[in-house]
């Protein structure tokens, strides 16, 4: 990982979908090692400081751009091996470029090889279908009220920092996590104990997530994609 503090210097971020940024002459994906040579050279010439990759966790549907995940602990094999991805990150750091990855702790896809009804039961999602179903995206919401689900997700975030030395995570679709009525009509959601729309368990999870990451990686970038102007969304909790 780089030895400089992203918080104390200007940032210019280049967002990339690894599968479509550039292809080979035969229309095939570039590998992580190809990207290490071509993408980093381009980003450096354009004076960007950070590369933000759309999700690189394993996912079954190319058209989802990686946002409907089955394998949270697997870097997608579309572009190579875990060591190939490590090579890409190392090459970026050698050139003074930080790596951010989009991460999706809000919902997961329903494919049979994924987390939904993992052993025939609702392990990662709520028993309450109203809470579990994400009708807007055709996916399943995580149940943040389960400590084992919180542990799974926080451990996964830590995994990407520890195993691949990335510099930050951009947390996808935070509004979907924070609001019980996100994308829902009247009658499709139940207020919290205070009678409002906030998902209290999701709020607690996000606080624990940031506390855990910054305890071990104080220079990490934790970026919320939050579309509703939720007050103090970026206020430190540590």
PLM feature spans:
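Alpha-glucan (starch/glycogen) binding determinants
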Residues: 1
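Substrate-binding/active-site clefts of carbohydrate-active enzymes
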Residues: 4-11, 17-197
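Conserved alpha/beta catalytic core and glycan-binding cleft of carbohydrate-active enzymes
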Residues: 165-167, 182-238
């Amino acid at each position: 990982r780089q030895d400089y503090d992203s918080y104390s210097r200007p940032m210019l971020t280049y967002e990339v979908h690894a599968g479509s940024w550039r292809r080979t002459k035969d229309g095939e994906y570039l590998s992580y090692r190809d990207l290490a040579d071509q993408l980093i050279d381009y980003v450096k010439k354009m004076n960007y400081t950070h590369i933000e990759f759309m999700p690189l966790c394993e996912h079954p549907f190319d058209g989802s751009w990686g946002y409907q995940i089955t394998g949270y602990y697997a870097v997608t094999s579309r572009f190579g091996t875990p060591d190939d991805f490590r090579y890409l990150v190392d090459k970026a750091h050698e050139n003074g470029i930080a790596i951010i990855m989009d991460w999706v702790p809000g919902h997961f896809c329903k494919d049979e090889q994924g987390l939904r009804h993992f052993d025939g039961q609702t392990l990662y999602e709520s028993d309450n279908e109203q809470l579990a179903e994400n009708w807007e995206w055709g996916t399943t919401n995580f149940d943040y009220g389960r400590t084992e689900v919180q542990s799974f997700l926080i451990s996964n975030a830590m995994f990407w920092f520890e195993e691949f030395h990335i510099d930050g995570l951009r947390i996808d679709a935070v509004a979907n996590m924070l609001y019980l009525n996100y994308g829902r009509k009247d009658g499709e959601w139940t207020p919290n104990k205070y009678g409002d729309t906030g998902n209290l368990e999701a709020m607690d999870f996000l606080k624990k997530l940031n506390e855990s990451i910054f305890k071990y990686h104080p220079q990490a970038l934790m970026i919320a994609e939050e579309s509703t102007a939720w007050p103090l969304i970026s206020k430190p909790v540590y």
